[in-house]
Amino acid sequence: MNTSMSWIKMYVPDLDVTAQEYTDAMTLSGTKVEGFEKLDADLDKIVIGQIEKIEKHPDADKLIICQVNIGTETVQIVTGAPNVKEGDKVPVVLDGGRVAGGHDGQKTPGGIKIKKGKLRGVESFGMMCSIEELGSTREMYPEAPEYGIYIFTEDAVVGESAIKALGLDDVVIEYEITSNRVDCYGVLGIAREAAATFDKKFVPPVIKETGNDEKASDYVKVTVEDPELCPRYTARVVKNVKIGPSPKWMQRCLASNGIRPINNLAVSYTHLTLPTKRIV
């Protein structure tokens, strides 16, 4: 059973502890924690930058020189990425910062430190990052290109933390839930336990019923053949469903829990199921 700290804090907003403090206290309270992973452990000094100008490298056909606005200044970065253009907003690791690994997705313990240098005689003061260099994968971020730099949407704010914008400023907690604690099989159960452990207020999700005066029975019939095994089974009808991408916040929520976001229907189903561990 895995949950992210950000998801727990959705239901316990006043929870303000470190991952280690959380792990120790939850284990002592009876909800054993096997361990935790900080998604940004090997990431540092990575901001959102916007490419303002691109020029060809004078001595290398496959390299380009980019002038990148990082909010406080404009820095020059040399790259061989084939997918960037002027106006793109990209993750930029600054001089002295760290990335988790290389383009191949292999993580380096402690990360890779980025220093300013020269590429074929032209100075470069940082590096633009692929999603793999940030320690994640295209499975978790399906909008990322197969080869090249990750491109943010137009609403990304230049100068802000790229780590936070991607939801990588999070901690994934791994629990060992025993069979006598079925109440903790879902995120809501874990959140209730955390609220009790740290003496914080538990804020349950607010569920608003939407729809119209139409009845589901006009479209589908539900028959419970064995009420003892299944005392209740209900159905709702959802019409005009269009398959497409799910909202970014929902994608990030699932990705931080190690679940690949597929489309709006699959992601919505999973996001409804995980808190209660009840089949929807």
Q: What residue spans do the PLM features occupy?
A:
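Phosphate-backbone binding interfaces of nucleic-acid-interacting proteins
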Residues: M1-E214
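Phosphate-interacting basic helix/loop segments used at nucleotide- and nucleic-acid interfaces
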Residues: S29-K32, Y175, R252-I259, A266
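Short active-site oxyanion
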Residues: V75, G258-P261
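Hydrophobic (often cysteine-bearing) scaffold residues that line and stabilize catalytic clefts
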Residues: T18, V187, S246-Q251, I262-L265
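Residues forming anionic-ligand binding surfaces in small-molecule and nucleic-acid pockets
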Residues: S161-E176, D218-S256
